[in-house]
A protein has these predicted regions:
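Charged, low-complexity intrinsically disordered terminal segments
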Residues: 1-109, 113-146, 150-523
Length: 523
């Protein structure tokens, strides 16, 4: 598949991947990665919770101990500055804080060790934020990649870095270690995105001589390649101080609000460059590796799928039809169905994906979908207009189920809702199990930030890994993926059917229906 799409394909070992099973372990794993880092820390998230001072203290302590350590952080500008500028209320003396003010304390305390970059979707006029509010403008597009790493290890996830994601919000997390090439790829990706983002600069203290230990006033400075980040990608794909692969940018800096076309060209060049690095690495492996059947049986592959609609980067939407076609061929050839599992905390399938699911022949594979029940939606019980979002997803879910019924696919397409008392559901992913390994488990999975909806396809910056388990089907990774699917399905206890939508609490008002249709491209 990587060859057909012109994408890099990384060879690794299944024994160097581990699924993390709970939010609390996810937090501990991130802390440990930061504490172990000797040379670099790289973090990419939608935002970091403004109260995550313990996590920032871990990073600050590690930076203090290791002056040679460098860190790069990439977050979304709109989401991270939603609360406004850092200030201290003159009456209550309480500070007004945000993700940006939290991270600004990093650049204030470690200006020679830390870069913080805030991505803001191209083409959005600043006056629009003031007219309708940042939270509404966020629907136009966000930096959504979730990558948390240090040195040659990292966690690929769909979770952000805030309290709910560390306690009672179900997501997915895969820890990769001893991965120098993949780690270089990811940090290079973050650095590249940093060059068409804003640099976060700590501003003058709010009150002379009175700096907040965990927050700072800040300013945003457009990069556009005008400034040199602390780290850069070298010609051989390694990342170090002084490495820089933006020569084209230096000749013509990116424009602040009109960078999408040029940034897209840079991402395409990045992808081709890394495809070449992977080919060279594989050739070196084949030339030097003594034949080892045990090692070959443990070989797994990772294909990063970048989806950046505003930049016209469409790896995921290009790959999805090929994934479904591969399952179709295997299922029909085996004369017995395979299985495709799909889950999203925000179930609003991109129209082409919806068609792929509905058009798939029942004799080739069955599809099992897990979505969040309304009370498991992260917006359930919120204030303001966002309180209607769970019912908007209910309406889109009902429309999908009606389409399943019109196709007569109720027996081959199963839709369940996930419910766990006191928890919300944020997991997203796809697993597919061909007929030959039906008893053993999935041979492939998609793990990352994409929710497979309209937003993921068209508006946000997404990075999702297509992971290929060893082809023997006997790999520990295959068994672990099967266990992961079963664990997620354990709380998927609400079957979606006509009886469910007939319940009073599932009746969607006409106002929400109309609004859902109008804004579904932003959900």
């Amino acid at each position: 598949m990587a060859d057909g799409l012109g994408l890099p394909r990384f060879r690794t070992r299944a024994s160097r991947m581990q699924l993390i099973k709970s939010p609390t372990r996810f937090y501990k794993a991130i802390e440990s990665i930061i504490e172990r880092a000797q040379e670099r820390v790289f973090l990419s998230s939608l935002y970091i919770g403004k109260d995550e001072t313990d996590l920032m203290d871990t990073l600050k302590t590690t930076l203090s101990k290791r002056p040679a350590l460098r860190a790069i952080v990439l977050v979304d500008a709109l989401r991270s500055t939603r609360e406004g500028q850092f200030r201290i209320d003159p009456v209550t003396r309480r500070p007004n804080t945000s993700c940006a003010s939290l991270l600004a304390s990093l650049t204030r305390d470690f200006p020679d060790q830390v870069d913080v970059c805030l991505y803001r979707t191209s083409g959005l006029p600043v006056w629009l934020e003031k007219l309708i509010g940042k939270r509404v403008v966020e629907g136009a597009g966000l930096q959504h990649m979730k990558i948390y790493g240090g040195d040659n290890e990292f966690i690929m996830s769909g979770a952000n870095l805030s309290h709910d994601y560390f306690s009672n919000r179900q997501d997915r997390y895969v820890h990769f270690w001893d991965q120098p090439l993949l780690s270089n790829y990811l940090i290079s990706l973050i650095l590249l995105c940093g060059h068409f983002s804003y640099r976060l600069m700590a501003a003058k203290a709010v009150e002379a001589g009175k700096e907040h230990p965990h927050h700072s006033a800040y300013a945003l400075q457009w990069d556009g390649s005008n400034s040199q980040l602390l780290l850069g990608e070298a010609d051989d794909g390694t990342v170090n101080e002084g490495g820089c692969h933006i020569a084209a940018l230096e000749r013509q800096p990116l424009r602040e609000h009109k960078f999408a076309f040029d940034a897209g060209k840079l991402v395409n060049a990045f992808t081709q460059r890394w495809r070449q690095h992977c080919e060279e690495e594989l050739a070196n492996y084949n030339n030097t590796q003594v034949t080892n059947d045990e090692d070959d049986d443990n070989a797994a592959f990772v294909v990063p799928l970048l989806q950046m609609g505003p930049l016209n980067i469409t790896n995921e939407t290009d790959a999805m039809p090929r994934i479904f076609e591969a399952l179709r061929r295997e299922g029909l050839a085996a004369d017995m169905p395979g299985c495709l599992d799909l889950t999203s905390g925000y179930f609003s399938l991109h129209s082409p994906y919806k068609s792929l699911v509905l058009d798939a022949p029942s004799e080739a594979f069955e599809t099992r979908i897990v979505a969040a029940a309304p009370e498991s939606n992260g917006f359930f019980g919120s204030k303001g207009i966002s309180r209607h979002i769970p019912m908007a997803y209910t309406w889109l879910e009902q429309k999908f189920w009606k389409a399943v019924q019109r196709r007569g696919k109720e027996r081959s397409i199963e839709l369940l809702e996930w419910v766990k008392s006191g928890w919300t559901y944020h997991a997203k992913g796809i697993w597919w199990t061909p007929p030959r390994t039906r008893a053993l488990g999935p041979t492939h999975t998609l793990i990352g930030s994409s929710n497979f909806g309209y937003r993921s396809a068209l508006r946000d910056l997404e990075c999702t890994f297509l992971v290929e388990a060893p082809q023997s089907g006997q790999s520990c990774l295959t068994h672990v993926l099967k266990e992961e699917v079963n664990d997620l399905r354990h709380n998927a206890t609400v079957p979606v059917n006509d009886a469910l939508f007939a319940q009073d609490d599932r009746k969607v008002s006409w106002g929400v229906r109309i609004a859902a249709e109008l804004i579904k491209g932003r959900l």
